[in-house]
């Protein structure tokens, strides 16, 4: 690990938006290496409290006074240019670096950077691969976009040359990285508040491919038509995977009673080994194939790959079992794109239940608007849909789109759908309507998980 880009280990580094999952991980890596760290966020959280316990100075709220001792300021893509700390930094000529630039510079200190990209499945695949790498004793540094029990959080600092991280395409952040193994899980239309269209997104992934050195590897889902159209851009070793085609394939797939897949891993029509997943759905078979390809490319032993995959029971907010109440199961999932919702509901359909309630909170106005037609078609596997208001995240409500409009379209299609403005009202509706043996599935990237927790903690 090298921090040459920071120049001086005595420098004080301030993070604007330190409570974010990636920013907090970067701060924790620096704290581990004895840097002086501060950060600000709009709200206190378990993440900010954990950083405080590790020695960071935490400010709640953004104020210009927060950056007075900073030598370098790191900020996220969600921070606006009129943020008082950004303004103060520019006035005082304090060096500014966005999160992606900072992470990219950090990656320069490692030889084997594994950057996992794709519209869907990044956190799960990064987490699954982390299990494999730890079983293989490669002592990796890990930065993941969710909480992973095996590392007791979202970051692990190792002493080897292996660095495993997610590579998000939003605002082309992943083009600032230095992958030795670059992974593309899938390509879909998303982040259309930044990209013009799907072709623009594919162009960004094409540029990502070109970042991989000649002796490095591209690991890609070969059955994704959007990936197929750009894979020829690779000037490195290429490993593809899939169910029916690819260098590495999953054959003889069977699902257990909880929709978890068992399958043979096949290369050149020869069985390498078999694995049994402990996470549900076809999409996780594909995620595991990506992890297996990376393990094979990194010369990890078959037994370590198998043990790593089979020891993975998921991450927080990815088809996470929250608990049971009166024999009613509550599961939470981070899905917020129509493709992800379809995959989650497909997995949930195989899960034992009588009636499935899907409680969905749309995430951002721009995504809800640009993918509106797809959102009207992705809930068919739910017996009943409950819609919360749109979670704004970084956006402002312009009045163009709302959850009631989505609810109206779902009802027009003959689906049972109810809209609510308040979480308390959703909870009360579930109390009245969910019966013995039913499944409540909370879905969305915002704070809809709170509904399930409210229900369980009655």
Curated annotation (Swiss-Prot):
Pathway it acts in? Cell wall biogenesis; peptidoglycan biosynthesis
Identify the InterPro entries for this entry: Mur-like_cat_sf, Mur_ligase_C, Mur_ligase_C_dom_sf, Mur_ligase_cen, Mur_ligase_N, MurCDEF_pg_biosynth, UDP-N-AcMur_Ala_ligase_MurC
Query: Cell division: is it a keyword of this entry?
Result: yes
Q: What is its main location?
A: cytoplasm
Q: State one Pfam family annotation.
A: Mur_ligase_C
Top-level taxon: Bacteria
Does the keyword Kinase feature in the UniProt annotation? no
Catalytic activity, per the record?
UDP-N-acetyl-alpha-D-muramate + L-alanine + ATP = UDP-N-acetyl-alpha-D-muramoyl-L-alanine + ADP + phosphate + H(+)
Q: What is this protein identified as?
A: UDP-N-acetylmuramate--L-alanine ligase
The species this protein was found in: Clostridium botulinum (strain Okra / Type B1)
Q: What is the lineage of its organism?
A: Bacteria, Bacillati, Bacillota, Clostridia, Eubacteriales
